[in-house]
């Protein structure tokens, strides 16, 4: 049976992610902060919620920045929400934070004066929104284009390499909802909270060989 390591660095509701993975038959799901267990896993999931400064402080304290660089190179790897944002170069949050830098680009604030067609938009962006699939990726298998996923975020990703944007969203501004490169895939939305389409994405991840 394959193993899926859900990286635990003290930030995020990891059990909901683990339960969703178990629900789709992903294999043996391990919530762990043990680097050896993470290195031995067949697949790795990197979730996260909260302030990016706190997240990055814990990631660096535990040595997970270098570990994430290592394990995301040679097996299927999925970043979720702040776990995705941590993979970028930097974030504007908390007066600026350097991140892991696996994907070029920056995490930017939606702003307090966000408008669309004369309507003021609340920040954080919270709720269901469409994701436009930019390319045909294995993790989009059996998920229709413009499927709706569940988002909760005040900061959005401005990708540095448009070719890595495999899914985009819009909330006052266009933003990268999904990034991919090699065996790495990352999403701003919460698949574990996104019902049918979110579970399908996790099922696709569980079956993906990491090639793209």
Curated annotation (Swiss-Prot):
Official protein name in the record: Imidazole glycerol phosphate synthase subunit HisH
Predominant cellular place of this UniProt entry's protein: cytoplasm
Claim: Endoplasmic reticulum is one of the keywords in the record: no
Domain named Glutamine amidotransferase type-1: residues: 3-212
GO terms classed as biological process: L-histidine biosynthetic process
Pfam families assigned to the protein according to its UniProt record, in alphabetical order: GATase
EC numbers for this chain: 4.3.2.10, 3.5.1.2
A GO molecular-function descriptor: imidazoleglycerol-phosphate synthase activity
Pathway connected to this protein: Amino-acid biosynthesis; L-histidine biosynthesis; L-histidine from 5-phospho-alpha-D-ribose 1-diphosphate: step 5/9
Assembly with partners or alone: Heterodimer of HisH and HisF.
Keyword Hydrolase: yes
Catalyses which reaction(s): 5-[(5-phospho-1-deoxy-D-ribulos-1-ylimino)methylamino]-1-(5-phospho-beta-D-ribosyl)imidazole-4-carboxamide + L-glutamine = D-erythro-1-(imidazol-4-yl)glycerol 3-phosphate + 5-amino-1-(5-phospho-beta-D-ribosyl)imidazole-4-carboxamide + L-glutamate + H(+); L-glutamine + H2O = L-glutamate + NH4(+)
UniProt keywords, alphabetically: Amino-acid biosynthesis, Cytoplasm, Glutamine amidotransferase, Histidine biosynthesis, Hydrolase, Lyase
